[in-house]
Structures are given as structure tokens and as C-alpha cells.
Amino acid sequence: DVLLERNAALVMTRVSGFGQDGPYASRPGFATIAEAMSGLAALSGEPDGQPLLPPIALTDEVTGLAAAFATMVALHSGVGQVVDANLLETMFQLMGPLVSLYGITGEQQPRLGAGLPYTVPRGTYRCSDGRWIAVSTSSDSVAARVMGVLGVGDDARFDTFEGRTAHRLE
């Protein structure tokens, strides 16, 4: 605050676990805590498995990027201000509408492994030669081509998103 009083154009960026104020502001903040509290860990993993944490410093890295971007925007504005980035809010942003949906409906998206509820099939698959491929079919036209390559292009169960979702495990 003293620095801002001396230089009204100053942009200060603060990065913390839970923000500068509020009930958790004084608590230690670590990426693992934010990943658990945001629901990311609960959402990650196989349907019948335990919650999983990301195998990289995802929260730290993404929060750093968000803070850097917000700082650049603040500098571009020419108006002095404090940029307050924190680990938990950054993870809530990554969770997209899932947090709001849970708050409104009480429904939690189930763990789908590498799958997404709106893209079927999606995942990594071992080929007959032992190598791996990554597949994501976010539209019916892409799914039709993938199903054709797999030899099930004429199977009506996989023609529509609804059909592919109903037969996700096949």
C-alpha cells in the first residue's frame, strides 16, 4: 500500500494459496491442497479408483501463467493496481462449469479416466504393433471416421453422441 501511494502507476502482483483476504488467507497454500479442494483430484482417475493428483506441478504452473497474464493486462492499462492470483481460484477456473453445476444441482461429474463426458471415444489406446495412439472424437463426423478405421463404421450404436456415450466402455 505504501508503494502504491508513492507510485500510482505501480502494478504489484501477489500469488498465494487462497488470496490476500478471507477465511483461508493465512493458511498455508500448496498446489496439492488446491487440487484437492477444487475437485480436480476427485474428478481425476479411473471410475472405480481413488482420486488422483496430477503428475506435474500443474497448479503452480497455471497459476504462474494466470498471474503473468493478469500482470501484463494491468501494465497495459497504465493504471496502478494490485493483481491477486491464488492457487485455489486458478483451479476453479480450470474446472470450468463443473463447480457451478455442483453448487446448483449437487451433481458431480464421475471419474472417467482419460475420458470426457462430451467426447466419446477419448483416450489412449494400444495398437496391434504395441505402439500407443491418442484419440478424441468431439464430433459425429470425426467419430464416424474413427469408427470406420476400427471396423465398426456400420454399427449404428456408434452413429451418434448419445449412442457412443451409452456404449462408452465397448
Q: Language-model features: where?
A:
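Aromatic-enriched alpha-helical interface/lid elements that frame and gate functional surfaces
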Residues: 121-170
